[in-house]
Amino acid sequence: MKKISMVIVAISAMISLSGCHEDPTYVDSYFQRQSVIEELSNELKGQYCSIFIPVIYNASQEQLDYKSLWKGEVTENGQPIIHYTFGGYENRTVTLQQVPICWISFVIKDTKLAEAVKLLPDYDISIPYSFASSDEETGEASKMGKIIYSDSKVPVTLNYGGKQHLVLFNFKCPSQFVFDADKRPISSGRIQLELKSIIVDNVIVQEIDGYSGEEFFLSIMSKTDPISK
């Protein structure tokens, strides 16, 4: 009788323990599948052009007259046009071509650094992109997705103050574009770059947060159809 009681207790304990354990729920995200990532990124691959809208203010809230400084292609009303390239699956980055980062000098407080930055040529800025579900709370393979643009850092070497310095322009890219994978072709959406900080020789010398007056935004409007594939 004692042995039977011990067996019953043991079985009860096992049932109790198994009841406390739940199998993890696997969320099948459509946008985690390699075949989907490859298909979407290769669909975006190509050269594009779009209206380019800079919003640049210094600490005195003076706005940069970018239209008079822009040397590239423009629309009929003088709005700058920027060219950019989407890499495909093997290179999931979008590259903004010939960005006038010399305009950053307008918001820099250090006059010597500002003068050096003003002399910089145009640079290409590369921004990594990825795909994710826009409906991650559900356990369904939703085809509503979003393009996520990552941050980008632009390093330059400058000589000023009698020394050579490594300067890093730290851009945030908060853009996320929601799309339906069943509706093709997908669009890249608006891409926005925000200059958040300037780093010289691994030291942050200026943060651009809007509270002190300086603002540096570059907005590239959405363009659906590529110039070339």
In which residue ranges do the predicted regions lie?
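Short, solvent-exposed loop/hinge segments that bridge or flank secondary-structure elements
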Residues: Y26-E39, Q47-V99, Q206-F216
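Extended beta-sheet lipid-handling architectures
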Residues: Y48-S50, D65-L69, V99-I101, I108, ...
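Bacterial Sec-dependent N-terminal signal peptides
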Residues: A13-N42, S219-K229
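Predominantly extracellular/secreted and cell-surface proteins with exposed
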Residues: Q79-P174
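Positively charged n-region of N-terminal signal peptides that target proteins for export
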Residues: M1-I4
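Glycine-rich, aromatic-bearing surface loops/beta-hairpins
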Residues: Y149-K229
